[in-house]
Amino acid sequence: MTTNEQKMCGFVGLFDIRQKSDALRTQVLKMSKNIRHRGPDWSGVYCGERAILSHERLSIVDPQSGGQPLFSRDGKLVLAVNGEIYNHREIRDELAGEYDFRTGSDCEVILPLYRKMGVGLLEKISGIFAFALYDIENDEYLIARDPIGVIPLYIGWDRDEQFYVASELKALEGVCTTIQPFLPGHYWSSKEGKMVRWYDRDWFEYDAVKETGADIPALRAALEAAVKRQLMSDVPYGVLLSGGLDSSIISAVARKFADRRVESHDRDRAW
């Protein structure tokens, strides 16, 4: 999506609670208020004995029913996400008959994939994202960030060693005594208790690609496919031009597909 990341959703999470969660709920809501500019359309909160998730939403896909945090049908999983899952329609088709989706949100696919694949879901989804998922029944959580870190994410600990996660640094300031950025292409599972790289490709190393020749047609096809899938939106979108070559090329490609909605596989006209 061509939306500026600073105008996307935001969330604050608290895990490993060692105090009464009711007392901490007010604190987390105050922290979330510091990033409310990221999500003016909806504010939602989950408050449990061992975890709290607060979400500020900017509606792009499924504005009517995609409010967060998202819950699984049985209410045992709760999810807060900032980002977009571009291949959610394909995943929904694959899970037809296996999972009863509650909303049209692109991010809801994370819930059944977690049940089915655990951290393996990260290789299944295509998009830009930062999310925190809490398994209420087992008191376990999973936090993850997209491959190159398009979506911001930070973590921290307070004096009682309670664990926080937030979309912006300022949500953690004044509460956490230790703060650090959450690395791109990594996840943090409560089972492992540390940051683990999940996105690792051989082309990270120059030696693996130094003999690879240029393939202009393949590059063009990949660029057009990337732009097209990121036009997914249930609200009108616009483009800001910086005057550089990259924004001009992306705008030209977007114009090529702008007349039809990618959500309906080009069957319906766009706005």
Go through the PLM ranges and name each one:
Residues 2-271:
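Cysteine-centered catalytic environments shared across enzyme families
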